[in-house]
């Protein structure tokens, strides 16, 4: 695409430059006296620099202007001028027409630029594995297990197992998710009515033995032997 654009620009530049070059050639052909007389003389030959060449041309121009021109009729001058103007106008108009007319007009014929060399040019879906057809199965006419390759059979069996497992998991999830609404409502009401007990924690409902770290036992579990012995001692002292 970029190459075609450069070609179009170069063609346009050539079309524009051609008429101007033609105009310069016409001017030089109409007035050949200056360059011819300058380069024919011995003064302008073998000049070392461009400045001296320009000075030489300037001197010869001034000399030509001082000389009296040859007598020409008005008809000849008018015909020469009309010819030169006609050539210049024809060249300029042809250049303008070439600029206006596009060499490759924008139409539907131009192909759309498809970015096939990029990986996002043509997005491809899931890659489909090609199905391999073996000549032995075609020649035999039947697809028996002996002719079918072992690797392909293993792949098919693994794919079937995966599909069955995925379907089973989906069914189990669906069964666990489907819960009656009445049961959930009654469970929420029971929780609201009763006290919240942290049964899911280890310390939610500890046993009586392990309560308070096992150091403090309840009154019912304490032995009454020390109290009985104390009363016995008191009664014996009072009797004495």
From Swiss-Prot:
Post-translational modification remark: Specific enzymatic cleavages at paired basic residues yield the different active peptides. Acetylation of beta-endorphin occurs in a tissue-specific manner.
Record's subcellular location: Secreted
PTM sites of type N-acetylserine: 112
UniProt modified residues of type Pyrrolidone carboxylic acid: 37
Modified residues (Isoleucine amide): 124
Signal sequence interval, chain numbering: 1-36
A Gene Ontology BP annotation from the UniProt entry: neuropeptide signaling pathway
Keywords annotated in UniProt: Acetylation, Amidation, Cleavage on pair of basic residues, Endorphin, Hormone, Pyrrolidone carboxylic acid, Secreted, Signal
Propeptide residue intervals: 111
Pfam family, one: NPP
Tissues expressing the protein: Pituitary and hypothalamus of adult diploid animals.
Molecular-function annotations in GO: neuropeptide hormone activity
GO CC annotation: extracellular region
Membership in a protein family: Belongs to the POMC family.
Function description: Melanocyte-stimulating hormone alpha: Anorexigenic peptide. Increases the pigmentation of skin by increasing melanin production in melanocytes.
Protein name per its UniProtKB record: Pro-opiomelanocortin B
Organism of origin: Oncorhynchus mykiss
